[in-house]
C-alpha cells in the first residue's frame, strides 16, 4: 500500500510540474501503439508503425516502450523526461545518428537500452548518459568509430555491452575502466588490429569476451591481465600469427576459440595456466608444429578440435586429459593412431579423424563409451576382427572413401547399437552381415565390385540405404514405391543441410559445450517418423535400371530380335556377294560393303542384348550388376559405338565419292581410284575406333546402363554428358555434309553435259541409304539431345525405346535396300551361282584329255587376242574401256542406265564403238561356249579373261558404270 501511495505521489508531482495543457491521463495509450497493462504499469508497443518521432502522449506509468523498426531520425530532448518507471527502451532499427546525453536524463530505472541497427556515428563525450541502473546496452550494428572515455561513466551497473559490427579500430580502454560490473562484452566484427597490455584490467567480473571477426594480428603479453573471472574467449577469424600465450593468466578459462587464424605452432605446455579448459576450437590454422605436452594434463577438457592442421603427422600426446569426450583432428597429416588411445581417453564419445592418411587402425576395444567414429577419406585397406570389438554403445561408423577391400566376417559382431554405417567409395566385394541387424542407415555406394543381392531379412530395421547399383534396391520396393526424383533430392538436400546442424546428420562435427547424443538421437527418431513411411533406397530403379526385364515390352523385345536376325543374315549375304563376286569391285560398291560390315556389328550387338534379355527374363535385378560391370557389356558398348560411327562415316564417304566421281569425270575424264577410296575408308575406320575407345579411357562410360552405351540421361557423369553431346553433334554434321553433297550431285547430273554413260543403280542406292538413315537418326538425336540438356521433359521410357529400336534399325534396312532393289546384287548372285555350278562340273570332268587342254589353250589365246584388239579399238574412241565392257556385258541381263536426261550428238566413231560394245557379249558368249564344250577349266578361263580385263586398269569404270 505504501508503494502505491509513493507511485501516485510521484505521478501527481510530475503533473504539477508540467503545464496544464500538457497533462496526460495516467493510463492513456498512444493512438499508433498497442498497450498492455502489467499491474499498475503499462507495456507500450509502437514497433513497425512508420513513426518519425516519439509519441508525445506516453503514459508516465510506462515501464516498457518499444519504438523499434520505425523511421525516427531524431529524438526530442524531453521525450522521455516523465517516464520515471521505464525499465526497457527499444529504439533499434531506426535512423538515429546521435543521441545527446540530456535525452536520457531522468531514466533512473532503465535497465535495458537497445540502440542496435541505427546509424550512430558518435557517442556523447561532454554529457555522458546517466543511467545508474542500466544492465544491458546494445550498440551493435552501427557506424561507431570511437567510444569516448566519459561516455559509459554513468553506467556503473552495466553487465552486458554489445559493441560488435561497428567501425572500431582499437579497444576503448578508457571507456571500459569504469565498468567494473561488466560480465559479458562483444567487440566482434570491427576493425581492431591490436589488443594492448592491460586493456581490460578493471573488468574483473567479465565472464564472456568476444573478439572474433576482427583484424587482430598482435596480442600484448599482458593484454588479458585483470580478467580473473573470464570463462569464454573468442578470437576466431582474426589474423593472429602466433599462439596467444597471454591466455595463461586466465585461470578460470573454460572455452577457448581461436580457429581460422594464421597460427603455425602450438608451443609446449601451451595451456598450463588454464586447468579448467573444457573446449578448445583450434581448426583452420596452418599448424606445422604441436608440442607433445601442449594438451597434457587438462583434466576438464571434453572437446578438442584441430581441423585443418595439415602439417600434423603424429597424434598429440593427451596424457592426463582423461575427460575428453569429443576429439576432432580432420584434414591433418596423421598417418597412424596410438595403440593405447582408449587407455588415454576412456570417456571418448565422438572421434572424428577424417581427411587424414591413416592406413591402419588400432583396436578400440577399451573405448566403451564411443558413440560416433568418423574415419572417412583416409587410406584404410582392411578392417580386422578386433578393430571395433566390444563397442556396444557405437551408433555411427563412417568408413567412407577409403581403400577398404576386406572386412573380417566378425568385425561388426558386437555392435548391437550400430544404426548408421557408411562404407561409400571403397573397394568391397563382400559385406559381412553379422551384427548389422540394427542398422537404420547404410551407405554402400561406390563399391562397384559389391554386386551381390541383399534382402529385407538382412536389414530388418533399415530406413535409408544407398547401394552401388539400382538393381539392389528392387528388393526394397524400389520399383513399386520409389518417389519422384525431385522429392528424393529435396530430402537428400535437407540431409546435407542437417549435416551442419544438430539433427539427423550421419557424422556431425560437434562444437557445442553441452553435447547430448541421446537428445540428438531422440530428435532424429522424431524426424524420421515424420519423413519416412517406407524404406528409401538409392539409386532408384527405372527404365534404364530395370528390376524385371532388360526390355520393357514385348514390342521392343520382338523388334530387337527381328532387327538382329535381319541384320545378321542380310549383311552377311551382302558382304558375301560384294567381296566374293567375280565382277568388278567399284569404289562405291566397296564402300557399300564396308557399311554392311558396320551394320553387321550393330546386328551382332543387338542380338547380344536380346540374348541377355532372354537369359535374365523376369529376374534381371539378380544379374544386372554383373552384366554392367562385366567385360561383355563393355565389348558390346565398344562395338556398338564403333559400328554406329563407322556406318555414318562410311555413308559420308559414299556420298562424297559419288559426287567427286561425277565432278572428276566431267573435268578430267576419270574418277578416284579404288586405292584412294580404300585409304579414305581406313581413315574413317581409325576415326571410329578412336571415338569408340574414348569411354575406355574415362571419357564417357559404357557400363552406365545395361544397354552398354553411354548414358543418354542428364544425371550421368559430366564426361559422359560431354561425350554424348559431342557424338550427336559430330553425327549431325556428317548428315549435313551428306545432304549437301548429294544435292550438289543431283544438280550436276541434271545438267546432262557428260559424254559418258552412267549406271545410276549405285547412285540411287546411296540416295536411299541417306534418306532412310537420316530419317531414322533425326528422332534419336533430337530426343537424346533434349534429354541430355533437359530442354523439355522426355520420359526415360521413351528415350530407352527410341535408343533400342530406332538406333539399330538402319542396320537391318540398309541391306534390304541393296538385296531387294539393287540389280548388282542379282547379277553378283548369278555369277556366284554360275561359278559354283561350273566348279561342280569341273570336278566331275577332271579326266580331261591332252587334246582338250590344247583346244582350251587355243580358245584362251583367241580370247586374249580379242581383248587386245578391243583395247586398240576403244583407245581410239571416247567410249568406256573394253575390260569394263567385258565385265558388265558378260551378264546380258544387266542393262545400261543413263543418269542424264539427254546426251550429246553421237559421232560415227561413237556409233562404231557402241556397235562394238553391243557385239562383244555375243563374241564372249560364243567363246565361253567353245571353252565349255571343249572341256577346258572354266575357272582358268575366267581368270585369264579377268587378267585381260585388268590389264587396262579400272579407270574406265568411271566412264561407264558404278
Swiss-Prot record:
It comes from the Eukaryota. This is Leucine-rich repeat-containing G-protein coupled receptor 6. Keywords: Cell membrane, Disulfide bond, G-protein coupled receptor, Glycoprotein, Leucine-rich repeat, Membrane, Phosphoprotein, Receptor, Repeat, Signal, Transducer, Transmembrane, Transmembrane helix. PANTHER family: GLYCOPROTEIN HORMONE RECEPTOR (PTHR24372), LEUCINE RICH REPEAT CONTAINING G PROTEIN-COUPLED RECEPTOR 6 (PTHR24372:SF73). The chain crosses the membrane at residues 559-579, 590-610, 647-669, 679-699, 723-743, 766-786, 801-821. One of its GO terms (cellular component) is plasma membrane. It comes from Danio rerio (Zebrafish). It is found in: Cell membrane. Disulfide bonds join 633-708. Coiled coil: none annotated. Glycans are attached at residues 71, 202. Receptor for R-spondins that potentiates the canonical Wnt signaling pathway. Upon binding to R-spondins (rspo1, rspo2, rspo3 or rspo4), associates with phosphorylated lrp6 and frizzled receptors that are activated by extracellular Wnt receptors, triggering the canonical Wnt signaling pathway to increase expression of target genes. In contrast to classical G-protein coupled receptors, does not activate heterotrimeric G-proteins to transduce the signal. SUPFAM superfamilies: Family A G protein-coupled receptor-like, L domain-like. LRR repeats lie at residues 38-58, 59-82, 83-106, 107-131, 133-154, 155-178, 179-202, 203-226, 228-250, 251-273, 275-297, 298-321, 322-344, 345-368, 370-390, 391-414, 416-438. The gene is lgr6. Residues 1-16 form the signal peptide. Pfam families: 7tm_1, LRR_1, LRR_8. It is a multi-pass membrane protein. One of its GO terms (molecular function) is G protein-coupled peptide receptor activity. Residues 20-60 form the LRRNT domain. InterPro entries: GPCR_Rhodpsn (IPR000276), GPCR_Rhodpsn_7TM (IPR017452), Gphrmn_rcpt_fam (IPR002131), Leu-rich_rpt (IPR001611), Leu-rich_rpt_typical-subtyp (IPR003591), LRR_dom_sf (IPR032675), LRRNT (IPR000372). Belongs to the G-protein coupled receptor 1 family. GO terms for biological process: adenylate cyclase-activating G protein-coupled receptor signaling pathway; hormone-mediated signaling pathway.
Amino acid at each position: 500500500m505504501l508503494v502505491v501511495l509513493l507511485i501516485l505521489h510521484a505521478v501527481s508531482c510530475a503533473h504539477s510540474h508540467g503545464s496544464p495543457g500538457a497533462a496526460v491521463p495516467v493510463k492513456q495509450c498512444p493512438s499508433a501503439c498497442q498497450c498492455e497493462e502489467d499491474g499498475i504499469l503499462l507495456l507500450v508497443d509502437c514497433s513497425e508503425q512508420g513513426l518519425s518521432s516519439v509519441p508525445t502522449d506516453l503514459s508516465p506509468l510506462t515501464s516498457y516502450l518499444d519504438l523499434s523498426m520505425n523511421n525516427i531520425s531524431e529524438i526530442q530532448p524531453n521525450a522521455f523526461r516523465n517516464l520515471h518507471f521505464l525499465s526497457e527502451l527499444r529504439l533499434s532499427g531506426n535512423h538515429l545518428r546521435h543521441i545527446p546525453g540530456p535525452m536520457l536524463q531522468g531514466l533512473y530505472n532503465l535497465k535495458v537500452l537497445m540502440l542496435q541497427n541505427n546509424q550512430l556515428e558518435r557517442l556523447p563525450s561532454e554529457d555522458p548518459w546517466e543511467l545508474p541502473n542500466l544492465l544491458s546496452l546494445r550498440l551493435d550494428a552501427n557506424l561507431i568509430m570511437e567510444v569516448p572515455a566519459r561516455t559509459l561513466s554513468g553506467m556503473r551497473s552495466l553487465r552486458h555491452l554489445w559493441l560488435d559490427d561497428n567501425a572500431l579500430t582499437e579497444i576503448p580502454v578508457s571507456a571500459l575502466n569504469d565498468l567494473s560490473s561488466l560480465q559479458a562484452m562483444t567487440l566482434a566484427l570491427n576493425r581492431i588490429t591490436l589488443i594492448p597490455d592491460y586493456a581490460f584490467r578493471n573488468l574483473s567480473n567479465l565472464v564472456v569476451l568476444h573478439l572474433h571477426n576482427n583484424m587482430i594480428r598482435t596480442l600484448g603479453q599482458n593484454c588479458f591481465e585483470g580478467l580473473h573471472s573470464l570463462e569464454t574467449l573468442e578470437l576466431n577469424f582474426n589474423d593472429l600469427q602466433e599462439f596467444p600465450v597471454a591466455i595463461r593468466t586466465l585461470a578460470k578459462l573454460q572455452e577457448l576459440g581461436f580457429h581460422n587464424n594464421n597460427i603455425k605452432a602450438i608451443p609446449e605446455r601451451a595451456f598450463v595456466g588454464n586447468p579448467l579448459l573444457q573446449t578448445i576450437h583450434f581448426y583452420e590454422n596452418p599448424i606445422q608444429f604441436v608440442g607433445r605436452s601442449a594438451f597434457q594434463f587438462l583434466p576438464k577438457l571434453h572437446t578438442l578440435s584441430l581441423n585443418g592442421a595439415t602439417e600434423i603427422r603424429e597424434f598429440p600426446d593427451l596424457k592426463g586429459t582423461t575427460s575428453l569426450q569429443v576429439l576432432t583432428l580432420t584434414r591433418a597429416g596423421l598417418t597412424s593412431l596410438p595403440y593405447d588411445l582408449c587407455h588415454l581417453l576412456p570417456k571418448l564419445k565422438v572421434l572424428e579423424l577424417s581427411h587424414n592418411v591413416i592406413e591402419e587402425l588400432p583396436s578400440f576395444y577399451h573405448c566403451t563409451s564411443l558413440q560416433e567414429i568418423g574415419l572417412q577419406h583416409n587410406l584404410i585397406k582392411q578392417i580386422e576382427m578386433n578393430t571395433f570389438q566390444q563397442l556396444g554403445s557405437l551408433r555411427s561408423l563412417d568408413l567412407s572413401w577409403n581403400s577398404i577391400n576386406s572386412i573380417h566376417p566378425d568385425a561388426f559382431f558386437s555392435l548391437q547399437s550400430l544404426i548408421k554405417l557408411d562404407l561409400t567409395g571403397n573397394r568391397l566385394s563382400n559385406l559381412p552381415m553379422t551384427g548389422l541387424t540394427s542398422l537404420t542407415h547404410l551407405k554402400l555406394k561406390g563399391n562397384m565390385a559389391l554386386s551381390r543381392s541383399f534382402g529385407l531379412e538382412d536389414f530388418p530395421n533399415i530406413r535409408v540405404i544407398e547401394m552401388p547399383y539400382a538393381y539392389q534396391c528392387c528388393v526394397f520396393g524400389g520399383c513399386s514405391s520409389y518417389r519422384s526424383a525431385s522429392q528424393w533430392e529435396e530430402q537428400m538436400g535437407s540431409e546435407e543441410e542437417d549435416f551442419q546442424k544438430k539433427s539427423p546428420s550421419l557424422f556431425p562435427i560437434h562444437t557445442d559445450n553441452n553435447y547430448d547424443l541421446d537428445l540428438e538421437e531422440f530428435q532424429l527418431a522424431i524426424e524420421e517418423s515424420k519423413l519416412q513411411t517406407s524404406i528409401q533406397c538409392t539409386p532408384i530403379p527405372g527404365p534404364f535400371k530395370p528390376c524385371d526385364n532388360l526390355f520393357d515390352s514385348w514390342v521392343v523385345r520382338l523388334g530387337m530380335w527381328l532387327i538382329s536376325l535381319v541384320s545378321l543374315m542380310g549383311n552377311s549375304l551382302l558382304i558375301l556377294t560384294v567381296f566374293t563376286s567375280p565382277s568388278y569391285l567399284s569404289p562405291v560398291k566397296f564402300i557399300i560393303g564396308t557399311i554392311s560390315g558396320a551394320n553387321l556389328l550393330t546386328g551382332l550387338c543387338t542380338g547380344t542384348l536380346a540374348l541377355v534379355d532372354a537369359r535374365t527374363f523376369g529376374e534381371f535385378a539378380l544379374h544386372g550388376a554383373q552384366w554392367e560391370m562385366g567385360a561383355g557389356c563393355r565389348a558390346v558398348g565398344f562395338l556398338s559405338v564403333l559400328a554406329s560411327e563407322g556406318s555414318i562415316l562410311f555413308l559420308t564417304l559414299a556420298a562424297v565419292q559419288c559426287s567427286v566421281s561425277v565432278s572428276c569425270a566431267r573435268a578430267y575424264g576419270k574418277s578416284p581410284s579404288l586405292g584412294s577410296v580404300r585409304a579414305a575408308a581406313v581413315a574413317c575406320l581409325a576415326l571410329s575406333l578412336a571415338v569408340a575407345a574414348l569411354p575406355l579411357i574415362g571419357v564417357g562410360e559404357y557400363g552406365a546402363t545395361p544397354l552398354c552405351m553411354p548414358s543418354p540421361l542428364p544425371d550421368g557423369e559430366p564426361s559422359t554428358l560431354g561425350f554424348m553431346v559431342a557424338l550427336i553433334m559430330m553425327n549431325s554434321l556428317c548428315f549435313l555434309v551428306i545432304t549437301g553433297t548429294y544435292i550438289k550431285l543431283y544438280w550436276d547430273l541434271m545438267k546432262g553435259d557428260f559424254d559418258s554413260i552412267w549406271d545410276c543403280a549405285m547412285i540411287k542406292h546411296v540416295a536411299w541409304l541417306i534418306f532412310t538413315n537420316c530419317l531414322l537418326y533425326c528422332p534419336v538425336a533430337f530426343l537424346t539431345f533434349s534429354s541430355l540438356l533437359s530442354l523439355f521433359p522426355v520420359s526415360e521410357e521413351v528415350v530407352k525405346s527410341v535408343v533400342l529400336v530406332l538406333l539399330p534399325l538402319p542396320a537391318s534396312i540398309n541391306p534390304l535396300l541393296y538385296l531387294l532393289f539393287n540389280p548388282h546384287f542379282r547379277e553378283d548372285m548369278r555369277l556366284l551361282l554360275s561359278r559354283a555350278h561350273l566348279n561342280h562340273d569341273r570336278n566331275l570332268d577332271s579326266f580331261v584329255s591332252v587334246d582338250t587342254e590344247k583346244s582350251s589353250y587355243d580358245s584362251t589365246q583367241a580370247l586374249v587376242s580379242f581383248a587386245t584388239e578391243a583395247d586398240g579399238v576403244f583407245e581410239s574412241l571416247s567410249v568406256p574401256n573394253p575390260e569394263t565392257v567385258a565385265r558388265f556385258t558378260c551378264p546380258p541381263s544387266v542393262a545400261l542406265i543413263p543418269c542424264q536426261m539427254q546426251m550429246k550428238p553421237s559421232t560415227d566413231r561413237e556409233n562404231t564403238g557402241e556397235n562394238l560394245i553391243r557385239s562383244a557379249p555375243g563374241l564372249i558368249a560364243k567363246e565361253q561356249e567353245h571353252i565349255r564344250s571343249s572341256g577346258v577349266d572354266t575357272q582358268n578361263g575366267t581368270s585369264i579373261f579377268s587378267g585381260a580385263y585388268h590389264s587396262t586398269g579400272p579407270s574406265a569404270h568411271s566412264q561407264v558404270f558404278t
